[in-house]
């Protein structure tokens, strides 16, 4: 669902409108409270006060709510991510402030818990190289992805591609009995004995589809992620990689919906 910049500006054209939105978003069923003039809080007839910014990303921030909201809008409207440098330019803040805002927004994008099921494609990739070069790829990071066809994705920054690591991630994130689609990597041969069904394709032999068996969905996600990291962020440290993986997983899992509203529901 497309949420345009014109709609955004009309809805959040002032600090008061932004604050009112946060209050209603966090306390939708609350009645009997009124806005305290000149303060960022609400109170009832008994004098009990509610501070809607408390325990949110906005608490104790010197950045205006309008700038925060606009930053969240930019993240929701972009397919390729938003760099701290771009936020600095758009918001007119320091680079340090822009980086912190971007970091906090990605924290809102952490992946939900819950098991994938049905037809699930499973694959791994390296940031900055290909698996054939794995032995030469010092300082490269591995990511594992599991995606339901026409459903959700779970993607994790993993320490290695050992059998135990991959099998553990499958057990933690995919419901038993699901149909898995993988490549020929040896670890996946073990899943049939663990309550999963499996079909595979031989990427090493240039086989990318065998009837219903393919990993094209997860490969498409990798392609988008790598293009975005390279084009928008240029490079991502291993320390912060999971937060960027979360960012693109969040967009994928909320495709077709209003990402801005989904993000604001997590503040």
For each feature predicted by the language model, list its residue ranges:
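Residue-level recognition of single "structural anchor" positions
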Residues: 1-267
């Amino acid at each position: 669902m497309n949420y345009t910049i014109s709609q955004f500006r009309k809805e959040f054209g002032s600090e008061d409108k932004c604050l009112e939105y946060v209050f209603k978003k966090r306390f939708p069923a609350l009645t009997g409270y009124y806005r305290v003039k000149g303060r960022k809080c609400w109170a009832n007839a008994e004098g009990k006060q509610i501070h809607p910014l408390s325990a949110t990303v906005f608490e104790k921030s010197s950045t205006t709510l309008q700038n925060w909201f606009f930053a969240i809008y930019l993240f929701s409207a972009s397919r390729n991510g938003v760099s701290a440098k771009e936020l600095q330019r758009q918001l007119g803040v320091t680079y340090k402030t822009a980086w912190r805002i971007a970091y906090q927004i990605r924290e809102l994008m952490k992946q939900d818990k819950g098991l994938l099921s049905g037809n699930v494609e499973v694959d791994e990739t390296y940031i900055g190289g290909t698996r054939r070069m794995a032995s030469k790829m010092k300082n490269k990071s591995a990511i594992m992805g599991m995606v339901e066809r026409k459903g959700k994705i779970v993607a994790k920054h993993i320490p290695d591609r050992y059998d135990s690591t991959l099998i553990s991630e499958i057990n933690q994130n995919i419901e038993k009995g699901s149909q898995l689609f993988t490549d020929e990597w040896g670890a996946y041969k073990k899943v049939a004995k663990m309550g999963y069904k499996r079909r595979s394709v031989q990427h090493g032999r240039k086989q990318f589809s065998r009837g219903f068996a393919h990993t094209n969905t997860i490969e498409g996600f990798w392609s988008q992620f790598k293009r975005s990291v390279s084009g928008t962020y240029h490079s991502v440290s291993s320390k912060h990689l999971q937060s960027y993986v979360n960012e693109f997983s969040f967009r994928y899992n909320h495709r077709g919906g209003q990402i801005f509203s989904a993000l604001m529901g997590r503040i």
